[in-house]
């Protein structure tokens, strides 16, 4: 099962505290309508802090949602709960080792919530784990960028991103 992380248009967060929930609810309704119109019924949709997350096993979700007005970006990710930074590192190595073979790479991490580690800690340790499979690290001009997002106790390993319309 994949998780799709949807970032809303930059106009929505600028709305007042009374108007913003209305726009966000409309965006959620539009996304659900688009999914149902395409025959996608197996999904779970949640919204938290301006980020919409859809869990679904259907591969068409990203292509459908990116065409909904108000969607800025859609990212397809593998998601899992974790107990420690070691869980994040071992799964990242398993997922991304084939992506970096013979290429220079960089690891980019975004983090939200309270943790005993920083984004840089994750990036450094994942980079260290992937280094043996790659041609090296190049932070300014990498061949491959490994994107990871951590929100509370869930880690998202970004596989692909689409810009919205």
Predicted regions and their residues:
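RNA-binding accessory domains that recognize and position tRNA/RNA substrates
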Residues: 1-165
